[in-house]
Amino acid sequence: MASTFTATSSIGSMVAPNAHKTDKKLMNKLSSSSFGRRQNVFPKLRRSSPAVVCAAKELHFNKDGTTIRKLQAGVNKLADLVGVTLGPKGRNVVLESKYGSPRIVNDGVTVAREVELEDPVENIGAKLVRQAAAKTNDLAGDGTTTSVVLAQGFIAEGVKVVAAGANPVLITRGIEKTAKALVAELKKMSKEVEDSELADVAAVSAGNNAEIGSMIAEAMSRVGRKGVVTLEEGKSAENALYVVEGMQFDRGYVSPYFVTDSEKMSVEFDNCKLLLVDKKITNARDLVGVLEDAIRGGYPILIIAEDIEQEALATLVVNKLRGTLKIAALKAPGFGERKSQYLDDIAILTGATVIREEVGLSLDKAGKEVLGHAAKVVLTKETSTIVGDGSTQDAVQKRVTQIKNLIEQAEQDYEKEKLNERIAKLSGGVAVIQVGAQTETELKEKKLRVEDALNATKAAVEEGIVVGGGCTLLRLASKVDAIKAALDNDEEKVGADIVKRALSYPLKLIAKNAGVNGSVVSEKVLSNDNVKFGYNAATGKYEDLMAAGIIDPTKVVRCCLEHAASVAKTFLMSDCVVVEIKEPEPVP
């Protein structure tokens, strides 16, 4: 039977209801005894520290070569799975989903992330090579499949040499030095991308989809090479492109009484002044000076504040309805620190000064000198757009540079995304591509392709372009012999030879996926000294790939080479694997 307790003490001690029945004589004896005086009758219980349970580990030593073979088996399983997507005739991979319909993808890094192998040692091998794909995706946004295939090549060729007794330390040093030298050679082969070539770069990355390539090229031409292009899931089966001009954010007018166009239910002002307040406006009297200036000047005014209380808002609405003022108000975008940053961005775009008490500015003493100016302002129920007049271009560029420095220091992807958003808003234009499809499964697959194409185009703008189709990597192999001469010893030169042989793997796999012999294709490509000559897997022809639009961004090829070499170095230096012993599942 459960006992009940009643709290009686002001400090929260609890006494049982029948405690008063305790024999008082007994208690007096205890309290007067030497035992009771010297020792606590009710000693505190010591809390026992929780036991630390460590899972047992299983050690796999590479004495007979079985551990490395298992690791390599994991690498091969992942690379073979991802490899089927490589090239214009690569296939799709169907991924099971716990919830909802299966996903059909053609994106290497998405496939790699889903792979978990049953054997723990093989799984570690797969995870190692997955790092090459993930890192390439983070830096270049494309080329993930090539990274995995190239890493597989480095590892396969390296394992053969190490198994024959070569020193893995010197071998990996040779791989590292050769890869570094080849990056320098790659930059010499690169050329700046022309506007007419942007569509080709995007199309190749999207699986030779000319429509996607043209749309991305058009988006970049409309917002500029350094403009911001974003993706959205469309509602129809067709792709669509539109450009949002000016600074747009998800905040609408605070009252529908401010509407100037009753059909569109929007507020539209030309040559508008802006008052920015980084606090809540509680008293309409604080606005008298600014509003009187607006009446005398005959200009429309937009107030952006943290919030506007009912009394102050009513005063603004009444003056607007009477026709005394052309006015509108909205709440500042964002929250907390981000809200203040947005207000500062708007101030720089419009030439305004933000009213802040911390810097000694008060609303009641504000005059025309703190107001900003916008060429156009459009407010709807949910969004607001401010188009600058171009007079603050230098200040905007300085602000963009500051934000770019913050992006380099930012660690979280979410923070980087928000900072990029701010750059887009300040730059005065965002192109939005709406990806359309017939079904949700097709939409997800198509969106991944468009995302890859967009990232590849941005990478091409950054570092230029080279010949695509795996031919640039194959041509780099011919530069290895000259690099070997500068290496310190024979084993480092063996490492260089490993790189030389592995560089043909991507081209051979592209050819294999197109149904032809990779070795024959690579020999025929190398037989022609023209660096632009190569195999077009989409048409099955040998031709000038640059003229045919088969182009890769230099940044993507560089990242593939660097990250594949890094993963191979880690792999070949490994000699022992530690994994957790799986606990047996409880019998139901």
Swiss-Prot record:
GO cellular component, one term: chloroplast
Stored CDD domains: GroEL (cd03344)
Keyword Transit peptide recorded: yes
Subcellular location: Plastid, Chloroplast
PANTHER family named in the record: 60 KDA HEAT SHOCK PROTEIN, MITOCHONDRIAL
Modified positions (Phosphoserine) in chain numbering: 101, 478
Keyword terms: ATP-binding, Chaperone, Chloroplast, Nucleotide-binding, Phosphoprotein, Plastid, Transit peptide
Primary location class: plastid
Pfam family, one: Cpn60_TCP1
One of the GO biological process terms: protein refolding
HAMAP family listed in its UniProt record: CH60
The protein's name: RuBisCO large subunit-binding protein subunit beta, chloroplastic
Species for this entry: Brassica napus
Record function comment: This protein binds RuBisCO small and large subunits and is implicated in the assembly of the enzyme oligomer.
Other known facts: This protein shows ATPase activity.
Organelle transit peptide: 1-55
Record GO terms (molecular function): ATP binding; ATP-dependent protein folding chaperone
